């Protein structure tokens, strides 16, 4: 069982709320979770041997929305109702190969993750609403300045609709060589 407070989850976007047009793109918007009604349920199965370690993990995550926005995008109120709760999930698998012929203590690690409405399990440490990167210059020919913005959401809904969960996947790998 894992704590599901706001700091431990990605936001939920009520796209019907009146907010600056740049809000969705800059990551500055109201988190529309309706509170914490259930912890996340997590588990894993792990095999640890001399030559390899393998692990399969999973998580179930409740998405509980705030009330629908009123006419013209005004603040949500109880009489407007809200979308039904939905459950998001994550599935992760990992493999680490040890005792490699490249040298003592060398390891090759690989993992893959799929999420549907539980983005924090894909990009750990989601503690806000966005990722922003700004660059004053690059070494690439023809480029001037750069900017990247990524809003990490568990889902999106509008007035009268259901929650559309965010889906994502990730693949990571690493090689440790002892010199």
Where would I find each of the regions flagged by the language model?
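Aromatic- and glycine-enriched pocket-lining scaffold segments that form the walls
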Residues: 1-89
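Detector for outer-membrane/organellar transmembrane beta-barrel domains
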Residues: 50-179
